[in-house]
Amino acid sequence: DPPYNVPVVGHVRLGGNSTHKEFVMASGEMTENQFEGFLTKSLGHSITTAKVGAVVLTLMDWRNLGELQAATTSVGIEQINLCVWVKSNGGMGSLYRSQHELCSICKVPGASHQNNVQLGRHGRYRTNVWNYAGVNTFGRNRKADLVDHPTVKPVAMIEDAIRDVTKHGDVVLDPFGGSGTTLLAAERCRRVGRLIEIDPQYVDVTIRRWQDLTGLEAREQASCETWNERAATLAKGQAIEEGSVEKEADHV
């Protein structure tokens, strides 16, 4: 779920006068060529860890579908379908209010992909139209979800997509981890989630959401500290540093 190169401000609102900060990268500042290059590079890195036959799902806004398709062609993965996420309500828009997002379904060539749908053979009736409530109709947790991330996706939708093309114990990689929806979805269907996220704020959100779901405590590998212990260590270090700065200022 990469950023769509669409500004957050003017396209996503929390409600009232509240707004979100822009994403670290691809938040409307890139040209078409730059964004295509961004997608090509990220997809290229991602598939270096994928086995042949692996399915690559990439969500995208209609504005930049062309750049995504060009990127998938450049890295040599085969598009096998295009799914449409249809939301319950329309969001922001100009001539028409946006009520859908797109999901490119590609495959790493060289082998058949896992297919857990098989035209309903296993009781899973799945089409390329995905009907799931958007964040504007998530329910009582809607505002909390939006506070966590401006473009949070429904966990159930990602969980179903994972179930379609993987087996228990498979590794699911999301190089744009965001608020951790893919990790939660993988946890719920007994897959192994592996996420990369550039923004520390969303890393913390992901860890909190995972802890809330599992009742477990995340630990940093290097220090073996729990997330809460690590936060306390960092806060203590910051307080000491701020105190040193204040003392230096007193002597100026």
Model-derived features: where do they sit?
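S-adenosyl-L-methionine
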Residues: 207-250
